[in-house]
Amino acid sequence: MSAVDEQNQPNLNYFNTMPSWQHYVSRTPKEFYDWYNGVSEEVAEFEVAELIRLSGDRKVIVDTNIPLDTLYKIAEPNHVAVMLSPQSMSVASFFNRGDPEKQFLLKEIEKCSNPEAAFENFKACIASVNNPEVYEAYLHSGFFTLIRENTERDTREEVFQKLAEHFELN
């Protein structure tokens, strides 16, 4: 039995009900934005429970999309790090990473009847969830924030070092 059901978590259940992957990559930016934020809200309760379970008597570091309003309720500012990059960077570099999920989506886009239009549309979808209002909300959230503006200059090692200092892991 799954803890996710269509009635209580329609956004998390989307992948069980979507017509096709081409439909997924062809939604409007507004539909994608609403779905993405719905998923963040719906999954937060599961993520918080898992964080409590994992943390026990140790520190854990996770990459999550827990919404700010939830983070304010459950975490001290020094227990959160927000990582931001400009919208242009997040959109331009989305498919440049080699992770299998991104490459899978790229292949699904190529299967669309008009792959170029589908690609541009999906980039607009990514831009919608990385819009300036969202960026500003995270930037001014009161949480520790790292801004990555240059993939060549801002190395992983530097980012890890800044995070280690923030979380007092050194």
Model-derived regions: residue spans:
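ATP-dependent small-molecule kinase phosphotransfer cores
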Residues: S2-K59, I66
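Alpha-helix-centered segments that form part of catalytic cores
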Residues: D34-A49, E116-H140
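Conserved nucleotide-binding/hydrolysis micro-motifs of P-loop NTPases
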Residues: I66-L68, S85-V91, E152-R153
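NTP-dependent small-molecule kinase module
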Residues: S128-N170
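Conserved catalytic network of the ASCE P-loop NTPase/AAA+ motor domain
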Residues: I52-S55, K73-P77
